[in-house]
């Protein structure tokens, strides 16, 4: 007890004064402590900003999977590290918020609330004391001769003043007692809670990095191995450069050059056998380079100027050179026309152009371009040029053109002439009449042929493909659905302009925390679909990501994609709580009925002991409730009938088809249904009502009818997509089809997000071997296709027709460069 006696005495007044002085000293201490706490939280905030800045810099440095420079130095590996560092930064921001909420705010509340109330109570007490003293003195100064009515009035004023005085005195006593009582627990609780927040911060950081420890060690081992390989390669390169320099010196000393350059003797008998062996290996599919090097080529224009070009003579008898060998290609002049199995020279549309650049180094190719120059089968070679005063020259004469070339020295001239002569002889000896006619018809006009280099100095396979003019793309791009696709993109852009927290707080129930009712929640659980406060978010994190994936509405900006926002807008805290807390409100009625029917007390569910907390309740109460709600699921109305489990899949199937995300969510939570079950394995064990079967048949017939009507209205624009439309409809009712397949065909992106959040296999295949990504491309649902690719969808998955998704994309009107890049990224 702070006051042994409540009588107004000098001892009582002295005790109150002592407690007021103590409260004032405590106020000063609290203010100093608050300044330190504020400086600490500001430091944590600056630390978080520095962490995010470092992560952003690392992400910018690491680049992406499509950047070959970043891939070369391990950019994708660094991206994995940035995810962990960003998560640690989020932990630090949570720590800052908790320190500010549990310590700084409570200190400020104590100073501005409790201690300030003591001062206000003292002022009211002093004022009441003066009034009471004046009334008492006035009453005591009355004479015996004073009239009774005047004395009664003064006495009544005295009683009123004393009542006010006592109320002010006891109010001051209450304020002092409250401040004195809080000293015993308020600060201990705040500081210990802050230390617990630090414990959770370091524990979460340790666990996250501990999980990454094997990967970090693996990367370090790989880096060490790469360092050793690089050192070995550098030593090998230095040795090769020294050997090359010695060879150049020997060739320079040993070259015999006549004064006019006419002393050459081109005897090819020594190398003829070697050339024939190499030419025979080309018939077996092995292409080798016989000779390569720089030659000066005389232009065929009026000026007849000389240009230095890099020539290659290969084992197929092809002689070609590189234009502008080490310059950047400008404009579209060097754009390749060779499309490896994907696009032809005249294929229109963005897709064919992009695929060409993808296989040959970019639309604006920065590599040299090889030009086919001459058909050696019908050519002869002569020494010297037309003018006899030039040295080291020789001519290649074909029926269509004469090429005048100049070597750098006599030895190179002799070697080129020997090699070309040997190749011509080999071509004449091995060429059949039929093959000769075919080559003449395809190559004699080869002066206009060009091919991009895709790795080495020349890619013989590309050149051979270009000669034969092969291409597998038969359907040019059309613009039938571009307006609808661009409209969808504009809608997504409008959503992106708003902040996620502004979009989601407009949903019913999202203005308060789903678990404790705290106003203005700014955290969320991605898979549960609820908005929660920062205090509950810490509890959710301790549940584990297999139960709740917690993200901030304001900090984790990249998480809030259109698919996630669509899912959250379809659910809301009110509906989600109706699923997870269905038995919470009805349990009181159930318990009353069980008591009236004589149900033993031990049989009552343990949920009677748990109540839903308020936002002012201690964190221990909230933690108990959240664990019971999500981990133990004691408020969920679960399905216990095994036959019910068999029927649930068919209900989920119909809900996905109808794009009813709420019903699908309820089935997943209440029945714990397997979202990866295949329709052929789950639905046929259930006999559906006749009305349901008739409804399904009517839906199927209506879809076929709409396809036929669309074809009749626009047969030309629909010629390429009719087969896809029919297969898409049939696919919905085919066997071995998962819920994700169906969602990609008939639902929106929010339904796909819901299934992915609950573990749907993104690369599951149906009876035709097609993944959901295949169906998205075929049905032109490009937004969902992009989502699947960003979540790990395999762009190289092959169906039973040996087609990958990009093959189907080449037959559609796809003009999204970002999606095309994801589809054609072979490193994914």
Curated annotation (Swiss-Prot):
Tissue expression summary: Expressed in roots, but not in hypocotyls or cotyledons. Low levels detected in leaf and shoot apical meristems and in siliques.
Residue stretches spanning the membrane: none
ANK repeat placement: 735-764, 768-797
Residues in the signal sequence: none
Cell location: Endosome
Cellular component annotations (GO), alphabetically ordered: endocytic vesicle; endosome; plasma membrane; root hair
Listed Low complexity bias regions: 590-600
Ranges for domain BAR: 1-225
Protein name (database record): ADP-ribosylation factor GTPase-activating protein AGD1
Source organism per UniProt: Arabidopsis thaliana
Upper classification of the organism: Eukaryota, Viridiplantae, Streptophyta, Embryophyta, Tracheophyta
């Amino acid at each position: 007890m702070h006051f042994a006696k409540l009588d107004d005495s000098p001892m009582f007044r002295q005790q109150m004064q002592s407690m007021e002085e103590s409260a004032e000293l405590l106020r000063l201490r609290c203010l100093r402590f608050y300044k330190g706490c504020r400086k600490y939280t500001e430091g944590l905030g600056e630390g978080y900003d520095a962490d995010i800045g470092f992560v952003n810099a690392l992400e910018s440095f690491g680049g992406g999977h499509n950047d070959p420079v970043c891939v070369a130095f391990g950019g994708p590996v660094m991206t994995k590290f940035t995810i962990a560092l960003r998560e640690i930064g989020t932990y630090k921001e949570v720590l800052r918020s908790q320190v500010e909420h549990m310590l700084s705010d409570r200190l400020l509340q104590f100073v501005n609330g409790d201690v300030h109330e003591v001062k206000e109570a003292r002022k009211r007490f002093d004022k009441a004391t003066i009034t009471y003293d004046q009334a008492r003195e006035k009453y005591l100064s009355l004479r015996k001769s004073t009239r009774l009515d005047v004395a009664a009035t003064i006495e009544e004023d005295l009683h009123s003043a004393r009542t006010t005085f006592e109320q002010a005195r006891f109010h001051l006593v209450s304020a002092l007692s409250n401040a004195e009582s809080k000293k015993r627990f308020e600060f201990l609780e705040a500081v210990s809670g802050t230390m617990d927040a630090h414990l959770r911060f370091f524990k979460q950081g340790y666990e996250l990095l501990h999980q990454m420890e094997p990967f970090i060690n693996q990367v370090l081992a790989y880096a060490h191995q790469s360092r050793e390989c690089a050192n070995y390669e550098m030593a090998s390169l230095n040795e090769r450069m020294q050997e090359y320099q010695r060879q150049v010196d020997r060739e320079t000393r040993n070259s015999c050059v006549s004064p006019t350059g006419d002393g050459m003797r081109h005897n090819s008998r020594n190398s003829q056998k070697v050339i024939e062996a190499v030419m025979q290996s080309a018939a077996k599919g092995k292409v080798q380079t016989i000779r390569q090097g720089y030659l000066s080529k005389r232009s065929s224009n009026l000026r007849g100027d000389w240009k230095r070009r890099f020539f290659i003579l290969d084992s197929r008898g092809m002689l070609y050179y590189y234009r502008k060998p080490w310059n950047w290609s400008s404009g579209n002049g060097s754009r390749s026309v060779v499309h490896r199995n994907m696009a032809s020279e005249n294929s229109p549309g963005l897709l064919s152009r992009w695929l060409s650049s993808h296989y040959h180094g970019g639309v604006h190719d920065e590599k040299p371009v090889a030009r086919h120059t001459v058909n050696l089968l019908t050519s002869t070679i002569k020494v010297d040029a037309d003018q006899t005063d030039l040295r080291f020259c020789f001519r290649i004469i074909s029926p269509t053109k004469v090429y005048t070339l100049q070597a750098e020295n006599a030895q190179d001239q002799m070697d080129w002439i020997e090699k070309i002569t040997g190749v011509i002889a080999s071509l004449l000896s091995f060429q059949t009449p039929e093959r000769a006619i075919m080559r003449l018809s395809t190559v004699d006009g080869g002066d206009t042929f060009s091919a991009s280099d895709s790795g080495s100095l020349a890619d013989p396979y590309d050149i051979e493909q270009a000669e034969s003019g092969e291409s597998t793309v038969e359907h040019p791009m059309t613009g039938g659905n571009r307006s609808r696709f661009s409209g969808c993109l504009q809608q997504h852009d409008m959503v992106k302009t708003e902040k996620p927290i502004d979009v989601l707080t407009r949903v019913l129930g999202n203005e308060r925390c789903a678990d404790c009712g705290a106003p203005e929640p700014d955290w969320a659980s991605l898979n549960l679909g609820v908005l929660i406060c920062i205090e509950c978010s810490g509890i959710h994190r301790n549940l584990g990501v297999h139960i709740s994936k917690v993200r901030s509405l304001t900090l984790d900006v990249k998480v809030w994609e259109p698919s996630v926002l669509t899912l959250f807008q379809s659910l809301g805290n009110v509906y989600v709580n109706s699923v997870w807390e269905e038995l919470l409100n009805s349990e009181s009625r159930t318990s009353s009925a069980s008591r009236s029917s004589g149900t033993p007390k031990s049989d009552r569910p343990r949920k009677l002991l748990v109540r839903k907390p308020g936002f002012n309740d201690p964190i221990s109460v909230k933690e108990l409730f959240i664990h019971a709600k999500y981990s133990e699921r004691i408020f969920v109305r679960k399905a216990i009938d095994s036959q019910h489990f068999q029927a649930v899949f068919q209900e989920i199937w119909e809900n996905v088809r109808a794009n009813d995300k709420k019903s699908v969510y309820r089935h997943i939570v209440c029945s714990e249904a397997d979202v990866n079950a295949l329709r052929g394995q789950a639905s046929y064990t259930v006999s559906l009502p006749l009305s349901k079967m008739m409804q399904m048949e009517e839906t199927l017939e209506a879809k076929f009818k709409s396809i036929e009507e669309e074809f009749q209205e626009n047969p030309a624009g629909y010629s390429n997509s009719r087969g896809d439309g029919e297969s898409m409809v049939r696919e919905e009712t085919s066997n071995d089809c998962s819920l994700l397949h169906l969602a990609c065909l008939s639902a929106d992106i929010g339904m796909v997000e819901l299934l992915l959040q609950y573990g749907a296999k993104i690369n599951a295949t149906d009876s035709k071997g097609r993944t959901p990504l295949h169906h998205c491309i075929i049905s032109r649902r490009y937004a969902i296709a992009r989502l699947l690719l960003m979540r790990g969808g395999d762009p190289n998955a092959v169906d039973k027709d040996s087609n990958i998704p990009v093959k189907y994309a080449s037959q559609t009107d796809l003009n999204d460069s970002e999606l095309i890049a994801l589809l054609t990224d072979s490193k994914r």
